[in-house]
């Protein structure tokens, strides 16, 4: 929070909203991009980014997936939210990341675009959490794994 002693104005440094997509390929793998830019250049990241003014979280995620990997996805299912910090140009921004799960509709045009060095399909169990760019994403991976494991247990009953 920033305070102006002259006029008593308070500026609350509230979180901005980010989105990330657990995009599946139909055989259980997740879509990951290797970041081409800082912060966390070279680390794995889910397709996603910041919500623009006037967008819903769902609209932002669909836009980011198109911009980053040229992919359309089916219906989005909310997974979880996680607090995060984004360090950029000397400033640490508080972020609230919203994570969704969706299936890829057609992967024929899939390729790395804006800010993405390369794309990879990786099974959730094969992920090295230390290779993932942001703490919020690592925590969301755990939620995804636990949710899928719980779903598998209930389907077998």
Q: In which residue ranges do the predicted regions lie?
A:
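Acidic, metal-coordinating catalytic segment for phosphate/diphosphate chemistry
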Residues: 1-21
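A generic structural micro-feature
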Residues: 13-15, 43, 90-96, 113-116
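Conserved hydrophobic "DFG−1" position in protein kinase catalytic cores
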Residues: 23-24, 32, 102, 121
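Conserved Nudix-box catalytic region and its N-terminal flanking loop in Nudix hydrolases
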Residues: 25-67
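A short coil-to-beta-strand element that immediately follows conserved catalytic motifs
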Residues: 72-81
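Active-site-adjacent beta-strand/loop module that shapes the phosphate/pyrophosphate-binding cleft
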Residues: 80-108
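NUDIX/MutT-family hydrolases
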Residues: 110-141
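Charged phosphate-binding loop/patch that engages nucleotide di/tri-phosphates or the phosphate backbone
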Residues: 137-157
């Amino acid at each position: 929070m920033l305070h102006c002693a002259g006029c008593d104005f308070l500026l609350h440094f509230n979180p901005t909203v980010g989105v990330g997509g657990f995009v599946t390929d139909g055989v259980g793998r997740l879509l990951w991009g290797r970041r081409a830019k800082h912060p966390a250049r070279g680390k794995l990241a889910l397709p996603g980014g910041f919500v623009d003014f006037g967008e819903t979280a769902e609209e932002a995620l669909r836009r980011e997936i198109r911009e980053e990997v040229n992919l359309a996805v089916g219906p989005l299912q909310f997974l979880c939210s996680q607090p995060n910090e984004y360090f950029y140009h000397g400033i640490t921004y508080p972020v609230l990341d919203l994570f969704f799960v969706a299936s890829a509709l057609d992967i024929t045009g899939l390729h790395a675009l804006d800010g993405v060095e390369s794309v990879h399909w990786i099974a959730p169990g094969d992920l090295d959490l230390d290779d993932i760019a942001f703490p919020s994403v690592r925590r969301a991976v755990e939620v995804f794994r636990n949710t899928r494991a719980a779903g598998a247990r209930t389907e077998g009953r």
